[in-house]
Amino acid sequence: MNNKQEEIDQFLSSTSTSPSPSSSSSPSNNDSTSLKSMISGIENLNVHSKGNDNKNNNNNNNNNNSNNNEKQKDIVSLENNSSSNNTTTTTTTTTTSNHNSNNNSNNNNNNINNNNINNNNYEPLVNGHNNGFGDKLNDQPSPSSHRVSDFSDEYSPSKVRILVADDDDVQRKILNNLLKKFHYNVTLVPNGEIAWEYINKGQQKYDLVLTDVMMPHITGFDLLQRINDHPVHRHIPVILMSGTAVDYKYANDTIKIGGQDFLTKPIAKELLKKKIDTVLQSIWQRRKEEEYKATLAQEREKGNKLAKEMELKEHEIEELTKKVSKMSSISKEAMESPLVSVTRNIEELLKQSSWSHYESEIKEKLSSILKELGSSNIYRPSFEKLIKNDSVDPVTKSFLVSEFSSTTSRRNSIPTFPQTTYNRDTKEVIKGWEFDVFKYSEDDLMPLLVDMFENFQLPEIFKIPIEKLQRFIMTVNALYRKNNRYHNFTHAFDVTQTVYTFLTSFNAAQYLTHLDIFALLISCMCHDLNHPGFNNTFQVNAQTELSLEYNDISVLENHHAMLTFKILRNSECNILEGLNEDQYKELRRSVVQLILATDMQNHFEHTNKFQHHLNNLPFDRNKKEDRQMILNFLIKCGDISNIARPWHLNFEWSLRVSDEFFQQSHYETICGYPVTPFMDKTKTTRARIAADFIDFVASPLFQSMAKFLKESQFLLKVISKNRENWQAYMELQKEGKCNDDDLQFMEDPTILVKSKLPKIDEEENRDKVSSSSSSSTAPLTSTSSSNNETSSS
């Protein structure tokens, strides 16, 4: 073994330079166009200049290429006594040496590898966010997918990219020359840490990792574990190498933790190729089989789908034939010409034998004839008769109206407002604290918003056309993202209904004007408009288009406010067109402040300011600043009101918001951003999140609410009971009787906690809630003021 090593050292020292690679396989930043890449490119100018110096020596290095290859063959023969291919082949490799003298090779290797790493402008993917209005925010960030080789071709070493990690310079060079002879594409790195950087952040994707076991910082086993634990890279096969005395133990450990194979140094050339080809050919073949099976399944699915479509088309043709036949008979009956009608009436008159007996009937028929002949649209009655026929389906009626009716307008193509009709009891229910928003669909909820506006006479006072109010509500609904678990239209309605309860059942309207209430209802509906499901912290860390647009300040709240007035600027949704200039300015100022007040980063500032005013000064309804403070307080209470709802509603909302939190922390981890601690599923639970939110955020706010609005004092007991329930869940989790993920499958969330808590006095709570819900404010009365506002008290 010593003789072998001496011969290797002698060969290496006799060669002062080695062939320069024809092309680098290390990641490059040439294609990057981001601001981050440009800055990194400027910082690494020196690195590029060093790379150019290496290129100047390329010609001299190539002159020695054949000699080096011949000498390398001799080295290989020392290990396995086998002959090698005499053909010199240039392959794409990434070297980790500057090819200087043998004495400085180790330091230069490390420097060049570090330069290669620094020269890569890695950019964790944050998909979407390419629009100032956040139109692409629903494209949630995901890690780059592993390169899938072209498995339609046969396996070939020239298609294989191998990453070699070894801290021994000599071993790296030997492996490099061995693998080059078999036409593999090779990237060399001096340690596991750099290898992981290349795998995880480099632009190059690898088909195999060949790593030494004993390396500083990150061992071969550590690198293997990281690859196996990663959702994207876990499919990369790993072969470990070692030359120590406990190889058999390393071999067993390699298989146990998911490695593909183990090699003992020194490695024979043919054995190395056989091991690599065995691993990769099996993967190649397996993926070809999977691809073939997937193709067969797709073809089978297409065949079944086509058969079903043919069957459906035959049924549609049969139904269409029946419909055409039916329509033919209907049209003959309905679409008769006016002259036919007149002729028939006259013929009936002529058949009368004695006109004197039918004088009244004759006058009636003649009057009908004159009316038909004098009509400006004498065909219209027949057309309307056809439209009203019950045998004509809605689609056909819509087609006839849109194509043949002179009253058709562009609005006929726009979706119509849901026409759900509610009785008086339902309209009273939305004033109650126990209103369950989850029992209604979005189409059911939208008409209730119109009722809220009408209850305060806002359409009459501010001249709001009902059609435009409906169009505004539908547009707001459309801009909320349906795939969000928490920040969706249901949440927006829930906040609006809560604030509506404050105004009516809790008598908060007495402190406000009609214009204040108008602004408050708009703000509640729009306060989370187009929310992407990721909070401001994520926007700033990811440097999304929205964070750049609003300079990292209340990013989402500014976005919600901007979209609100963008909708209101549309002529079909402009419910502010009846306001004068002063009213519009005041409403806009108020709406912007209200939506910005929902930014939780400013929560304690708003809360403390309100508490200080409440403790020291009475609120003056004539002061605009006092009314705005009340408005901000009401929308903030509404925004987090789910903690004061009955237990089953608080439970459902808490699950939904924690789902969004956990989703954000998951993507923060993948993208390498700082993980928000209270959202990290590995460090907290749903019950812990809910309990902490009650303790530190919601409870102080609703204590002020109870002092400000006496009718709301019973909410403190509801909050206390909810807090006890969450505490019970935390204790059950500590005892191992309840798993955090099990909470989302519970039909009755009170079952588990009953064993830990005294029975809830449901009757007492129900009486208190119903007594508060039954009280509502009297209709608002109009009073004139300097700016044409009306009082809401």
Swiss-Prot record:
It catalyses: 3',5'-cyclic AMP + H2O = AMP + H(+). The keyword Nucleotide-binding applies. The modification 4-aspartylphosphate is found at residue 212. Disulfide bonds: none annotated. Disruption phenotype: Rapid development. Cells are 4-fold more resistant to the antitumor agent cisplatin than are wild-type cells. Additionally it produces fruiting bodies with spore masses that cannot rise up the stalk during development. Mutant cells grow exponentially at the same rate as wild-type. Disruption of regA in a tagB null or in a tagC null background resulted in higher levels of sporulation. Disruption of regA in a dhka null background corrects the defect in stalk formation and suppresses the block to sporulation. GO terms for molecular function: 3',5'-cyclic-AMP phosphodiesterase activity; 3',5'-cyclic-GMP phosphodiesterase activity; 3',5'-cyclic-nucleotide phosphodiesterase activity; cAMP binding; metal ion binding; phosphorelay response regulator activity. Its cofactor is a divalent metal cation. Residues 1-153, 756-793 are annotated as: Disordered. The active site is at residue 487. Its EC number is 3.1.4.53. InterPro entries: CheY-like_superfamily, HD/PDEase_dom, PDEase, PDEase_catalytic_dom, PDEase_catalytic_dom_sf, PDEase_CS, Sig_transdc_resp-reg_receiver. Induction: Down-regulated by phagocytic stimuli. A divalent metal cation 2 binds at residue 528. It is found in: Cytoplasm, Cytosol. Keywords: cAMP, cAMP-binding, Cytoplasm, Hydrolase, Metal-binding, Nucleotide-binding, Phosphoprotein. Its main location: cytoplasm. Residues 13-34, 54-69, 80-121, 770-793 have a biased composition (Low complexity). GO terms for cellular component: cytosol. The phosphorelay mechanism involves the sequential transfer of a phosphate group from Asp-212 of pde2 to 'His-65' of rdeA. Phosphorylation of Asp-212 activates the phosphodiesterase domain. The keyword Nucleotide-binding applies. Belongs to the cyclic nucleotide phosphodiesterase family. Phosphodiesterase specific for cAMP. Involved in the degradation of intracellular cAMP. Morphological suppressor of tagB. Phosphorelay protein that accepts phosphate from rdeA or supplies phosphate from regA; depending on the relative concentration of the phosphodonor proteins. This is 3',5'-cyclic-nucleotide phosphodiesterase regA. It comes from Dictyostelium discoideum. The lineage of its organism: Eukaryota, Amoebozoa, Evosea, Eumycetozoa, Dictyostelia. The gene is regA.
